[in-house]
Amino acid sequence: MIENLIQNTTPSHSKSSDPFWEKSETALLQALMLYLLHEAPPEEQNFSMVMEMIAAADVHEDDDNYQSPLDILFERLEMREPDSIACKQYRIFKQAAGKTAKSILVSVGVRLAAFNLPSIAKLTMTDELHLQELGERMIALFCCIPDSDKSLNYLVGMIYTQLIQTLYRQADRIHKGRLPVPVHCLMDEYANISLPKDTFLSALATMRSRAIFCSIIVQNMAQLKAMYKDDWESLVGLCDEFLYLGGTEKETHKYVSELLGKETISTTSYNQSKGRSGSYSINHQQSGRDVP
């Protein structure tokens, strides 16, 4: 869940080479979510409560002895359960110096800011999707997003990523490798979703054996190149079929033409000369030409 969240809320064009911040955010989120998982009732195990816990965190750079309400919460848990995994992850976060810890809190808060919106909080308050059932019986799940606003597209990316992970667990642990009901993901306007590269390419290579299938629909090849840079050919190569419905983008035309290869052109020429010693000949030739 946390890896899914981090990957889908990290911009695809992000060039940060320092993993410290993401790992620090991950440690904090693990502490918060594990606390809710083990200590909170099911109705409080949601992103809204995670945001409340982040709001309860505070760091005073000039006072190392200051304890925020969140610090006290984990301190009490550690007194009851010294080996709590949630407390162990929280201690990792607390190793950061005051200024660094505050930066981590700000970074997590910005990453999860959308979950402060009432509509998003309500949407993620309870699990109404029951993703594990998609491979058990015939179900149609529609994820509709506006084409004029991309600010919340990552939510659909999270659903797809969580769906694939859930179905993998169902197939491997319950059905010994293959779902009883095949699941087909029709990813229309895939450029607006842009699933995390490493996770999705790995899944795309192995999902068919588990009766999970994806149709990746884009406007042109330029969209794939923009999303996956040097790995776009890997994504295309992992697809069994390639369907081209036409378009006006030059590079896509060129790519499809090269896929099709050359076609054989048969040419017949007729030559005739008139006069006292006139002649007539027919010449047949075959040549190769790129398919337009």
Residues covered by each model-derived region:
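Active-site-proximal loop/turn and secondary-structure-junction residues that shape catalytic pockets
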Residues: 191, 220-222
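P-loop NTPase motor domains
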Residues: 1-212, 227, 237
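Structural recognition of the conserved hydrophobic beta-strand(s) that form the central parallel beta-sheet
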Residues: 213-219
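Conserved residues at beta->alpha junctions
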Residues: 146, 218, 247
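P-loop NTPase motor core of the ASCE superfamily
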Residues: 12, 17-26, 31-34, 132, ...
